[in-house]
């Protein structure tokens, strides 16, 4: 229900958005309600007339008039709070008046509602209930949302409160320290300055009792909550008795608190000013402001420009350049913008631009290259007075099965050949042998003789002092023998020829000496300067003479080095051991390698955890020409990498990061170089149809892995090639099986095995894992598998020719050619060509071959027959039918 414009109209009206109400006959008025702090609000109130009989109006109005009479106003007090107004009496709700109209002063009786009005009222009440239910649900959802938000906000507030308390505690400690410092300074200032404020405070104390009564009011109004002598902090509590008279509640007296120190008191009030024992001192905030002012004046003074020497590499970021110059990066970017270049703070600029910026800002520039991090690692010249003789390093080289390892076993009194798979050497090994005559040690390096291990032989020749060329007396000079000669000459080391297997009946040492002349190796017996010794590793013949020749050659070389310097060496072999981690076989060439040294080899670094000799013993250090196994690398280095000891880990990280970057760039240039050239595009078009054989290779050492990759690379052709998805050192893991599953690849394990999880995953996913111990078997199997991907060769074999004499139309068969075989034979089911005027018009197969209405398999030359083609009928007299057979021949690599 809504009220109409006419206040006297009592008719009912229904609004669809409001509930049904009855408009009462009331009179309205306004009352101004007062609040604390001087705030007021105008409130609309309802005036109700009360029916009075006779002269009862006089006595009824008496209490109201008495209550409305204002109390005498007290004298104005500055510190008293404003008197709050009494709240208006609660008004009765309109619903009670509507429900009981007979009690109103007007005495009006409502009429009975009609059916339409009752229906409208019921509809309005139903709508109101639905709306109330929706509002209740919305309110509950809002409360739930606020509760969750309040929980998060509460946690944030608690964290902020903890930070604030910690900050306040820190400030409190700082202020306490400053306060103590100021007290100490005042104490030193002198006692006279402290007496003067005390004398000035004495008359103020005597005047305090007389000043207090003047500030108190003479008469206090009821309900006023101020107390004489108090601050404007809040009103006093007022208690009213049963008669309505207000009486103040007197709070219990508190014990007088001790006066706080002058440094800790707050605002200056009248009471504190009159009762203070000394003059007010300077506050901590004032002292802090003065200090900040002095600092501000000092900062406004012009500062002297600091000139720095800036090290500028080949490429540097703007942020790094600004840090090295102690300048703001914004200033550097602004200078680049003046030159017309837009850059961000993390952009990389070249050395020339960086030098220009640094010089413009007044700094000096020192240009360095990225490779300068490797300066001082190798080839440091030693003082000749600090050098001492060292043992020679001898590399045994030669063709496969010429007895290199057997000769070394005879010298070492060991049996290495039996430990190698297939009785052939597939790893490079380093050993030390003590000469029985001189007692001096000789370091031997055994290299494989297979064609696949060319890189191993090259590494052995680089780190050696003397090369022993082993040639079998019954076999002579072979391809790998020639390769070993070339490696030795490239390294510039002397050669000692060991003619082995002289115990065999067909041994011909003179033939070996003569064949060596073709490769510029002239032995002493033929007038040259190359030493040759006839030995037998099986019978241990002339081994002492061979050791004597090695010692003599070492004396001629005068091998010396400094043992008291950081170690340098070469990684002979590297592998990933399951129990020990990355293990590298290192030949120390200069200095002494100790446990705990920080080492760098290639792109890997580490700290030496243990050193193991060739005999399997753990040692604390390794001197020059000593081969050891080094444990402690972060990852297995590559065979052939040079090892160096650095002073700290920071230098090691710089070197390894530079080398890793160079390695990535080299790999990127090999794979993505010349992509835009025409030749590269043409080669890519040719290799689009090339089939790939995906492989994952895991080997025991880096050298074997390198040899396998080189051999597989040579197997590739224009039609098929091996695609190496991953190649690494160590056992076959589950991640290798997962990678093979994605590309349907074959996993090859060379002298390694798969762990239990990897084997189970391979069996579950159908991934083939092949294990090998001999490199030749691995290469042969991959060669056969890749040959299966080659398209077979198709070869045609001519059978014979036939001439068509006449064409016959036969029902249910179609056209049949009557032919005479001119040469050879014609077979049913063979491939045929239809030639007309020396032009091939059709190629297909014979569907029918008859002779005198009988199906035959073949027809000989000179005989007549009937022929029909499959799905072809356009045959004419005079055409020639050529019959041939296609043979499929499997290809191989």
From Swiss-Prot:
Compositional bias of kind Pro residues: 71-92
Superkingdom of origin: Bacteria
Residues annotated for GTP binding in this entry: 398-405, 446-450, 500-503
Region (G5): 536-538
Region annotated G4, chain positions: 500-503
InterPro entries, per the entry: EF-G-like_DII, EFTu-like_2, IF2_assoc_dom_bac, IF2_II, IF2_N, P-loop_NTPase, Small_GTP-bd, T_Tr_GTP-bd_dom
Entries under CDD domains matching the protein: IF2_eIF5B, IF2_mtIF2_II, mtIF2_IVc
Bias (Low complexity) ranges: 59-70, 93-104, 197-226
Keyword GTP-binding: yes
Gene Ontology molecular-function annotations: GTP binding; GTPase activity; guanosine tetraphosphate binding; translation initiation factor activity
Key words, A-Z: Cytoplasm, GTP-binding, Initiation factor, Nucleotide-binding, Protein biosynthesis
Subcellular location per the Swiss-Prot or TrEMBL entry: Cytoplasm
Biased composition (Basic and acidic residues): 128-148, 155-196
Location of region: G3: 446-449
Gene Ontology cellular-component annotations: cytosol
Region (Disordered): 1-266
Segments for region (G1): 398-405
Coiled coil region boundaries: none
SUPFAM superfamilies linked to this entry: Initiation factor IF2/eIF5b, domain 3, P-loop containing nucleoside triphosphate hydrolases, Translation proteins
Spans annotated as G2: 423-427
Protein task: One of the essential components for the initiation of protein synthesis. Protects formylmethionyl-tRNA from spontaneous hydrolysis and promotes its binding to the 30S ribosomal subunits. Also involved in the hydrolysis of GTP during the formation of the 70S ribosomal complex.
Family: Belongs to the TRAFAC class translation factor GTPase superfamily. Classic translation factor GTPase family. IF-2 subfamily.
Name under which the protein is recorded: Translation initiation factor IF-2
């Amino acid at each position: 229900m809504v009220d109409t414009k006419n206040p006297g109209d009592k008719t009912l009206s229904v609004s669809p958005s409001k509930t049904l109400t009855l408009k009462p006959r009331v009179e309205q008025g306004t009352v101004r309600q007062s609040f604390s702090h001087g705030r007021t609000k105008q409130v609309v109130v309802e005036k109700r007339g009360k029916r009075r009989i006779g002269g009862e109006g006089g006595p009824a109005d008496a209490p109201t008039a008495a209550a409305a009479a204002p109390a005498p106003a007290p004298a104005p007090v500055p510190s008293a709070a404003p008197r709050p107004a009494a709240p208006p009496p609660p008004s009765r709700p309109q619903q009670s008046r509507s429900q009981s109209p007979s009690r109103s002063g007007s005495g009006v009786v409502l009429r009975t509602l009609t059916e339409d009005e009752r229906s409208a009222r019921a509809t309005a009440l139903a709508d109101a209930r639905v709306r109330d239910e929706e509002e209740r649900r919305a309110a509950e959802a809002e409360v739930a949302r606020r509760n969750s938000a309040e929980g998060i906000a509460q946690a944030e507030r608690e964290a902020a409160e903890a930070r604030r308390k910690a900050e306040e505690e820190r400030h409190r400690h700082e202020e306490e320290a400053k306060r103590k410092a100021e007290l100490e300074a005042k104490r030193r200032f002198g006692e006279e300055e402290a007496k003067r404020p005390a004398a000035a405070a004495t008359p103020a104390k005597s005047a305090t009792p007389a000043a207090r009564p003047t500030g108190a009011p003479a008469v206090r109004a009821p309900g006023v909550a101020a107390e004489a002598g108090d601050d404007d902090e809040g009103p006093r509590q007022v208690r009213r008795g049963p008669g309505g008279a207000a009486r103040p509640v007197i709070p219990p007296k508190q014990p007088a608190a001790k006066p706080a120190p002058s440094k800790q008191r707050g605002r200056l009030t009248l009471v504190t000013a009159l009762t203070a024992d000394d003059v007010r001192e300077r506050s901590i905030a004032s002292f802090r402001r003065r200090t900040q002012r002095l600092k501000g004046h000092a900062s406004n003074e012009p500062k002297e420009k600091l000139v720095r020497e800036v090290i500028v590499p080949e490429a540097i970021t703007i942020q790094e350049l600004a840090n090295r110059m102690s300048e703001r990066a914004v200033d550097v970017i602004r200078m680049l913008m003046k030159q017309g270049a837009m850059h961000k703070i993390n952009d990389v600029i070249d050395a020339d631009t960086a030098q220009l910026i640094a010089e413009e800002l007044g700094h000096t520039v020192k240009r360095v290259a990225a490779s300068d991090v490797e300066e001082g690692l190798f080839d440091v010249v030693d003082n000749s007075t600090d050098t001492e003789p060292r043992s020679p390093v001898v590399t045994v080289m030669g063709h496969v099965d010429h007895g290199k390892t057997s000769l070394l076993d005879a010298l070492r009194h060991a049996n290495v050949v039996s430990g190698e798979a297939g009785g052939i050497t597939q790893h490079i090994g380093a050993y030390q042998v003590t000469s029985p005559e001189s007692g001096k040690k000789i370091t031997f390096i055994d290299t494989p003789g297979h064609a696949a291990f060319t890189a191993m032989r090259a590494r052995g020749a680089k780190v050696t002092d003397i090369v022993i060329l082993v040639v079998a007396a019954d076999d002579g000079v072979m391809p790998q023998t020639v390769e070993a000669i070339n490696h030795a000459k490239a390294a510039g080391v002397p050669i000692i020829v060991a003619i082995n297997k002289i115990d065999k009946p067909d041994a011909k040492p003179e033939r070996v000496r003569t064949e060596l002349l073709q490769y510029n190796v002239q032995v002493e017996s033929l007038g040259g300067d190359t030493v040759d010794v006839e030995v037998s590793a099986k019978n241990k013949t002339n081994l002492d003479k061979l050791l004597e020749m090695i010692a003599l050659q070492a004396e001629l070389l005068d091998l010396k080095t400094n043992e008291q310097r950081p170690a340098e060496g070469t990684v002979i072999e590297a592998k990933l051991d399951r129990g020990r981690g990355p293990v590298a076989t290192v030949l120390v060439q200069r200095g002494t390698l100790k446990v705990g040294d920080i080492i760098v080899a290639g792109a890997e670094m580490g700290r030496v955890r243990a050193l193991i000799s060739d005999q399997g013993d753990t040692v604390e250090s390794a001197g020059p020409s000593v081969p050891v196994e080094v444990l402690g690398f972060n990852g297995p280095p590559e065979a052939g990498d040079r090892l160096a000891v650095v002073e700290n880990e920071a230098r090691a990280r710089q070197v390894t990061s530079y080398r890793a970057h160079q390695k990535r760039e080299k790999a990127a240039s090999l794979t993505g170089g010349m992509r835009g050239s025409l030749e590269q595009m043409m080669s890519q078009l040719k290799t689009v149809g090339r089939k790939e054989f995906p492989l994952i290779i895991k080997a025991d050492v880096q050298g074997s892995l390198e040899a396998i990759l080189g051999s597989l690379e040579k197997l590739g052709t224009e039609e098929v090639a091996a695609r190496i998805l991953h190649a690494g050192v160590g056992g076959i893991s589950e991640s290798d099986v997962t990678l093979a599953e994605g590309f349907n690849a074959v996993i090859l394990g060379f002298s390694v095995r798969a762990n239990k999880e990897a084997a189970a995953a391979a069996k579950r996913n159908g991934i083939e894992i092949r294990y090998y111990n001999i490199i030749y078997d691995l290469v042969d199997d991959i060669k056969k598998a890749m040959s299966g991907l080659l398209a077979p060769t198709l070869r045609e074999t001519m059978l014979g020719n036939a001439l068509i004499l006449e064409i016959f139309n036969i029902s249910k068969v179609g056209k049949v050619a009557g032919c005479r075989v001119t040469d050879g034979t014609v077979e049913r089911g063979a491939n045929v060509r239809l030639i007309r005027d020396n032009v091939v018009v059709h190629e297909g197969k014979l569907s029918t071959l008859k002779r005198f209405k009988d199906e035959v398999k073949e027809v000989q030359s000179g005989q007549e027959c009937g022929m029909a083609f499959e799905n072809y009928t356009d045959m004419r007299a005079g055409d020639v039918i050529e019959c041939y057979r296609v043979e499929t021949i499997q290809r191989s690599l």
